[in-house]
Structures are given as structure tokens and as C-alpha cells.
């Protein structure tokens, strides 16, 4: 393995930087959903981007607002990015397939229910003004599961910093 500071040949270096910028966009989207931060979610998209999320097809801006509203019913959510295949097609265009798993915790029938979503995002990206972002996303459903939660893990969870679904949650600002 070459040293971390070894220079890659021109095009390979540009592709590696582009792929990392695209991955960061995917992470901003997920973090924004989990923190109910539409602005952070929207930063993953370019102006005028579109999104087909099955239950909603339209502008990315409208999707982000809708997601924040709809996710308020959950006690907590966690959107996880898994495999992220990216193909850089030229200096300003790329496509990607992002595997994702989402955990959604909600109150149900006097207890708590964990809903789990497995899916993929099929993305088209563009680089505009030296910024890579999504211009079109299709959300593909693979499968889902819903199950009642039993007792919590036998750990002293109250001793940990507790997460929240907003900008005030521990770790949001690095503190």
C-alpha cells in the first residue's frame, strides 16, 4: 500500500477526490434526516435537483421538508450508508448506487416498535462550481421489517451522552 501522502496520477487523483466529495454528500443527507435538519439534507443536492422516493416524487427541497415533517413522529432514527459504488463519467458527471439501512423507533400499542428499511439510492451527480452533489435520486425499496422491542440492553445507558433528533443532540457540533 502506498504511503497516505503519495500522489496519484492526475486523473486518478481527481476521481478519488470526486468520489470522496460524493460520499460526503451521502453522509450529510443521512445526518440531516436523523437530526431533522432540512438544510443539511438539502446540502447533499444541487439547486433544482429532483428525488423519487416512491411516496413522493418532486424537488429535493420539497422532499427534505416533507421528510423532516414525517420523521417527527419517531423517537429516533438512524440512516446508515453501506456500500457506495461511484462511477465518475467525466469531469462533472457521475452516477452512484448507495446501499442503505434505516432504523426508525416509534411508540406503538403501549410499547416501542422498531421499523427497519433496507434499500438503495440510485443517484446522478454533477460537479458545479467545484462542488459535487446529487442532481437526481431514485429510492429503491428492497425490504422492510417491523418488530416490537423488548427490554433494553443490560447496560447503564444513562451514563452515556444521549442523542436527540435535532441540532442539539450530543455530537452534532462535535462536543
Residue ranges and their predicted role:
Residues 114-116:
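Outer-membrane beta-barrel transmembrane domain signature
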Residues 2, 95, 118-152:
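Short beta-strand edge/turn micro-motifs at domain boundaries
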Residues 21-22, 39-40, 59, 87, ...:
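Hydrophobic/basic alpha-helical segments enriched in Actinobacteria
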Residues 145-175:
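Acidic/histidine-enriched, glycine/proline-rich intrinsically disordered or flexible terminal extensions
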Residues 9, 99-109, 118, 145-147, ...:
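Extracellular/periplasmic carbohydrate-active domains that bind, remodel
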Residues 33, 45, 100-102, 138-141:
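Short beta-strand segments enriched in hydrophobic/aromatic residues
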Residues 38-104:
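A solvent-exposed, acidic/Ser-Thr-rich amphipathic alpha-helical stretch
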Residues 1-31, 35, 39-43, 47:
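Short, low-complexity N-terminal intrinsically disordered segments enriched in polar/charged residues
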Amino acid at each position: 500500500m502506498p504511503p497516505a501522502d503519495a500522489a496519484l496520477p492526475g486523473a486518478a487523483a481527481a476521481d478519488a477526490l470526486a468520489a470522496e466529495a460524493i460520499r460526503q454528500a451521502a453522509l450529510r443527507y443521512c445526518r440531516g434526516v436523523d437530526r431533522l435538519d432540512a438544510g443539511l439534507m438539502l446540502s447533499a443536492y444541487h439547486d433544482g435537483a429532483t428525488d423519487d422516493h416512491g411516496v413522493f416524487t418532486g424537488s429535493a427541497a420539497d422532499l427534505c421538508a416533507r421528510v423532516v415533517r414525517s420523521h417527527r413522529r419517531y423517537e429516533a432514527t438512524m440512516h446508515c450508508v453501506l456500500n457506495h459504488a461511484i462511477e465518475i463519467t467525466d469531469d462533472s458527471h457521475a452516477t452512484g448506487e448507495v446501499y442503505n439501512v434505516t432504523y426508525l423507533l416509534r411508540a406503538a400499542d403501549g410499547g416501542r416498535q422498531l421499523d427497519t428499511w433496507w434499500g438503495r439510492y440510485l443517484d446522478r451527480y454533477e460537479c458545479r462550481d467545484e462542488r459535487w452533489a446529487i442532481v437526481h435520486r431514485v429510492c429503491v425499496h428492497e425490504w422492510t421489517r417491523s418488530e416490537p422491542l423488548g427490554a433494553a440492553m443490560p447496560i447503564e445507558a444513562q451514563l452515556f451522552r444521549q442523542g436527540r433528533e435535532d441540532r442539539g443532540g450530543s455530537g452534532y457540533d462535535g462536543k
